[in-house]
């Protein structure tokens, strides 16, 4: 009898709980977690207390170019690049970097501009070479820019 490992399923549920807690949408969970849609929806409702949001994921790289979004996106992506060098997987790097981003914003007394979905989309845009970072000539910080500009 072949069945799903109880330990593997427990890890999948824990991963889903972590991702939902960070604000991941069902479309993201579908790609990263091997649970059925029904279980993902039930988990989401149990954790958030509401039905999951419907609609499309963000699709415009231009959103990251406004000054406040750019500062937050640049901060997150620089954290992500560092974490990606030391993480076991891209997903671990994404989760760790997003937690560090939220922690940094909280310590500074600010509000997070980048939600988890936008952070994930940002990483995808870099992987697709739609966005890149460019160093500022004054401060030498790396900021998110459109590729090929």
Task: Label each residue range with its predicted role.
Residues 1-18, 22, 26-27, 31-149:
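Long, charge-rich, low-complexity intrinsically disordered regions
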